[in-house]
Amino acid sequence: MFQVQTELANHGAVIVALFEEETSRFVQELDKAFEGQLQGLLDEKELSTKKKSISKVHSLGKTNVKRYYFVGLGKKEAYTTETLRASLSKTFKTLQAEKIQDAAILLDSFVTEKLDAIDVAHIAAEVYCLGTYRLQTYKTDKKEHVELEKLVVITAEDAKEIEAALTVGYVHGRATNSARTLVNMPPNMLTATKLAEYAVELAEKYDMDYKVLEKEEMEELGMGALLAVNQGSTEPPKMIALIYKGKEEWKDVIGLIGKGITYDTGGYSLKPRDGMVGMKGDMGGAAAVLGAMEIIGELRPEQNVIAIIPSTDNVVSGTAFKPDDVITSMSGKTIEVLNTDAEGRLALADGITYAKKLGANYLVDVATLTGGVIVALGNHTTGAMTNNETLFEQVLEASMETDERIWQLPIFERDKERVRNSKFADLNNSPGRDGHAVMAGTFLGEFAEDTPWVHLDIAGTSDTTSTHDLGPAGATGVMVRTLATLVERFGEE
């Protein structure tokens, strides 16, 4: 798939960087073969240097390359990893759409003082996967697609180091696509049982320990919160645990907890039709955790990790749980149910407690939890909450490295008072619509207790209704790369 070479050969296409107000030595060398015509195109603004612009130039036999794709990156001083990701992803999409199977990239043309060749190689391989991802459909009339099968990386840097960076980037991109495919699956095809089977296959592939708790075992452990959500369903619930041992001693364990609600009708607090369509994606947190575990399994960081996925659907029937019910969670805390559509936090409550039972010293939960976070932060920023600023800073640094933006929301004492306000139980699961995202996160904090914890609400970032820089409409695979990067950096400390 990737080859590292020092010189150009015969290629269907070559990708070259263009910065504003600067003609690089790479462009100057090409311009000699074009007898000054490239500089003329630049002077006439027919080769664009604007961010994310792509200009195609046919060689017309002047070189052994058929066509060149010049990628505009804007001003060099404003050049970022986010610009690089978006620009290269768009380029790979373009090559795929134009049915080019063999391409090369002048890697060093994208290198600056801020971004070295290792960074560029990692990002190029990552967005090679992300940008060319195709939505998996079930149409009987399937179109034949031509894929971009080969990318040759031209660089003067050390080949082994570049190959290693390409491998890591590719693993990150491929695992993100795995998560996308899971989230896009129809709910009749991805039940809690099927999700558990997927997780077990992943664990066995990468030699991880695993446990899948059945309903009877959950009852023995007192997982009343997850079981309450499952009451209305004919599909059995699953509590999934994947255990990766990256150190000889079982300590400093990171617990990744992903919400695995395979379909959410809202239960008796029923969603309207428009609010229900798309709820197959309510297991986006579970997919993010499984994607991260795929990366961890491939790259083998020296860090202990537990992945926990509480999984069920949330449907209506004569046996479904109801507003006014009082349930007992695995932690022993009782919960007054005021809203059955606030079910994700109930499942996660038992997931967090189970992660602690298995030895997690740090907790990061990921969930498509609230519409409130979309109102607050929109569809491009993940909401975050924490009880430990040190852990949050580590998550934030990982997210900045992957360009998956997060923003911290507060937890004040009055927020805790609101989730503890119940005449009948220790907690209530839905204090009201105002501050909805904060209330949900604060509720989860009651189960994290003193264990360092970060909550990531991906309700706005888990999917998109239109094509975007890094892929097609549908699931984004958000937080896969951030979680994996967090674990990788923990393992390096």
Curated annotation (Swiss-Prot):
GO terms for molecular function: manganese ion binding; metalloaminopeptidase activity. GO terms for biological process: proteolysis. Its main location: cytoplasm. InterPro entries: Leucine_aapep/pepB, Macro_dom-like, Peptidase_M17_C, Peptidase_M17_leu_NH2_pept, Peptidase_M17_N. Binds 2 manganese ions per subunit. Pfam families: Peptidase_M17, Peptidase_M17_N. Its EC number is 3.4.11.1, 3.4.11.10. Keywords: Aminopeptidase, Cytoplasm, Hydrolase, Manganese, Metal-binding, Protease. This is Probable cytosol aminopeptidase. The gene is pepA.
